[in-house]
A protein has these predicted regions:
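Thiol/selenol-based redox catalytic cores and closely related redox-interacting motifs
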Residues: 73-151
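Bacterial N-terminal signal peptides that target proteins for export
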Residues: 1-10
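N-terminal signal peptide c-region/cleavage motif recognized by signal peptidases
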Residues: 18-20
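Active-site-proximal beta-strand/loop segments in catalytic clefts of secreted hydrolases
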Residues: 32-34, 57-60, 90, 112-114
Length: 151
């Protein structure tokens, strides 16, 4: 097999991967957030627009949920659980899909803080501003490495 054909096969497989995940049915996401957080609602909309089935749980304090999910050091304004993984903050749907395809031995993903330009922090009220940031893969011991860089 020549390199060109191999490249085409790899590209075709990569393009079909999101379709494969969707073919298995909608992925359920549970989100814990405070009742007044608008950017959390915008992130929930982003996830729904990308094919996830989202259930929200309004709580007064997301801290205990975050700690129980292994994300205490990577706080943002909401914590989600999807297929056994924690998703802390404004993580893009495509990174969650990649996580579900790769299935790493990890606690989950985190976008610490509230980075401008990330899903839910990208509405007109932010004036198109973007903050360079990383989505982190958080291991089960609390350590992390860059999963995807946004510059």
């Amino acid at each position: 097999m020549n390199v060109s054909r191999l490249t085409r096969l790899v590209l075709a497989a990569a393009l079909c991967a999101p379709t494969f995940v969707m073919a298995q049915g909608p992925v359920k996401v549970d989100v814990w957030k405070t009742p007044t957080c608008g950017c959390c609602e915008d992130w929930v909309k982003h996830m729904r627009d990308n094919g996830f089935t989202v259930t929200t749980h309004d709580v007064q304090d997301t801290g205990p949920i975050r700690r129980n999910a292994g994300m205490a050091d990577y706080g943002s304004c909401h914590t989600a659980m999807v297929d056994g993984y924690a998703v802390e903050g404004h993580v893009p749907a495509r990174d969650v899909r990649r996580l579900l395809l790769e299935k790493p031995d990890a606690a989950g993903l985190a976008a610490p803080g509230m980075p401008l330009g990330s899903p839910g922090m990208d509405g007109p009220e932010y004036g198109g501003r973007k903050t360079p940031h990383d989505v982190l893969l958080v291991d089960k011991q609390g350590g992390a490495r860059v999963y995807e860089a946004y510059r």
